[in-house]
A protein has these predicted regions:
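Bacterial N-terminal signal peptides
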Residues: 13-27
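Initiator methionine at the very start of the polypeptide chain
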Residues: 1-2, 31
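A residue-level marker of the well-folded mature domains of exported/periplasmic proteins
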Residues: 31-364
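Bacterial N-terminal signal peptides that target proteins for export
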Residues: 2-16
Length: 364
């Protein structure tokens, strides 16, 4: 090789190295300059809904060093939520996670005022050009927990303390009962709706009322599972947690298992979309196969053969070879809701206004 060619090759290598440094540095500058604001309806240490979102953005921060977080907890819905979001934007936030169902309308209003800011809302049913909605489909996980509960119960009476009789929660209770009956045809699930997402006094009263009826496994669909699982523990009953992996420590002896949201990878994806300019408004629905949701570790009361049984069914769900709501299915009034051979799709859960045969209680 001639001296001229050697010098030329070195020059090209230097240019490529310099370009690589610029590109890497450019990505680092973007990460360093990104501010993400997240507002929570409750405490970030509630062992449930809010803690799951808080853990999600912390995982995002670990995945993307340099991203700055602005977190505010215990933000009421309505005007207060709007004010907090606007304050975050004034502090430089270009990403807002409005982490409560009731924040949707406030987020839409603020999004209209700040079109260059990207908003993300869990469970929303409306979007905007700069607002994405997302959620994790939970019936498969509830079915699996129903299987574990159906194998664990001594009385064949299971119970659920539920915030409100909305379709997605009814679907979860139905899935739980179907899972329980798949391994224990005598299992029944009694449900109490308390009318709110967080009220420890009402949660304890509902839990005790169910336990007084002979229920020996309690599940919960409210923001924080702590009160219900602790009430079960105090009365030597079993429990199934929801929302966060951190719930088990509050009732270790009676713990069967739980369902936990794992938002870290999704929040990392959102931040990267904003950083690289690929954001687009969309509605995202994932589940066990998408790593938005996981099963918490099983408790000591669950035998190895039950863990294996549940794990095998989980693999079927993830492979798409099994469906939760496969007919024939009747509601608890005896009306056929899903014909034999048909499947009620998970994408239509918003239309589920009934409780399946075996559930004691009414949605209205």
């Amino acid at each position: 090789m001639s001296l001229t060619l050697t010098r030329a090759a070195r020059t090209v290598r230097c240019v490529l190295v310099a370009l690589t440094v610029v590109l890497v540095a450019g990505g680092a500058v973007q990460a360093q300059g990104l501010k993400v604001g997240i507002l929570h309806i409750g405490s970030m240490a509630d062992g449930g809904y809010n803690q799951a979102h808080a853990e999600g953005v912390q995982a995002m921060k670990r995945n993307l060093p340099g991203v700055e977080l602005i977190e505010v907890e215990n933000v009421p819905e309505g005007a207060d939520a709007e004010r907090v979001m606007e304050n975050m934007i004034k502090q430089g936030a270009t990403v807002i996670v409005a982490a409560s169902f009731g924040y949707l309308e406030p987020a839409l209003r603020v999004a209209a005022k700040y079109p260059d800011v990207k908003f993300f809302h869990p469970g929303g049913y409306k979007r905007a050009p700069n607002l994405t909605t997302y959620w994790a489909s939970t019936p498969e996980a509830f079915y699996l927990m129903g299987m574990a509960a159906g194998k664990t119960t001594r009385t064949n009476k299971l119970g659920y303390v539920v915030a409100l009789p909305i379709s997605f929660f009814l679907a979860n209770v139905n899935a739980f009962e179907l899972g329980a009956r798949s391994v224990n045809p005598k299992a029944e699930t009694r449900v109490v709706f308390i009318g709110t997402f967080l009220d420890p006094a009402k949660e304890a009263a509902a839990a005790n009322a169910l336990l007084d009826q002979g229920v020996d496994v309690l599940g919960v669909i409210v923001d924080s599972p702590i009160t219900v699982v602790q009430t079960a523990e105090k009365r030597n009953a079993y429990s199934v947690g929801y929302h966060s992996l951190g719930a088990q420590k509050f009732a270790p002896k009676g713990w069967i298992g739980g369902i936990a949201f794992t938002w870290g990878n999704l929040y990392t994806r959102f931040a990267r979309q904003v950083m690289d300019g690929t954001f687009k408004s969309e509605n995202i629905l994932g589940g066990l196969a998408d790593d938005y949701l996981t099963l918490a570790p099983f408790g000591p009361s669950v035998p190895a053969d039950v863990v294996a049984l549940v794990s095998a069914k989980k693999q079927e769900f993830m492979a798409g070879t099994s469906q939760v709501f496969t007919g024939p299915l009747k509601d608890n009034r005896g009306v056929e809701r899903v014909k034999a051979g048909a499947v009620f799709p998970l994408t239509d859960l918003g239309k589920m206004d009934w409780l399946v045969e075996g559930v004691i209680g009414q949605p209205r």
